[in-house]
Amino acid sequence: MRTLVIEPLSKEAFAPFGDVIETDGSDHFMINNGSTMRFHRLATVETAQPEDQAIISIFRADALDMPLTIRMLERHPLGSQAFIPLLGNPFLIVVAPLGDEPVSGLVRAFVSNGRQGINYHRGVWHHPVLTIEKRDDFLVVDRSGTGNNCDEHFFKEDERLILAPHQ
């Protein structure tokens, strides 16, 4: 099994998979009579059907034991999905490029600094939310509508990966 190298999350490195939601280096302008800085259009919500709705939820995720064996990835073919950390804690992101199935050799891992969120583009393969050391809350923006919006792929045993953030 290959151990994933965990990369710092950056807009450039994550671009094939989606958007990094952060204020650093982002376009902004003043609003509210100069009392508020608006960081504009940090990500775009994607939905497949005109009747779909963009929705906002909170996910409360428990930390998983590390090192973690990556046995599966999922994707949302009908809409994007954004995770914005609410408690300021770093979290892990595991992704693979678009395709009919994820390719184990192309899987990448990133770590958010806790002030960065991410928006997976529609159809991007990813692991479910991964907190590092404790329960964490995330603001989630995704779509609600008809149709199956979650495909799962389970890797064969020899394709599985190891995620070890403390090594």
UniProtKB/Swiss-Prot annotation:
GO molecular function, one term: ureidoglycolate lyase activity
Summary of subunit composition and partner proteins: Homodimer.
Family per record: Belongs to the ureidoglycolate lyase family.
Reaction catalysed by this enzyme: (S)-ureidoglycolate = urea + glyoxylate
Pfam families: Ureidogly_lyase (PF04115)
Protein role: Catalyzes the catabolism of the allantoin degradation intermediate (S)-ureidoglycolate, generating urea and glyoxylate. Involved in the utilization of allantoin as nitrogen source.
Highest taxon, organism lineage: Bacteria
Gene transcribed to yield this protein: allA
Protein name: Ureidoglycolate lyase
InterPro entries the UniProt entry points to: RmlC_Cupin_sf, UAH_cupin, Ureidogly_lyase, Ureidogly_lyase_bac, Ureidoglycolate_lyase_dom_sf
Enzyme Commission number, as recorded: 4.3.2.3
Membrane-crossing segments per the record: none
Cofactor(s) this protein requires: Ni(2+)
Pathway it works in: Nitrogen metabolism; (S)-allantoin degradation
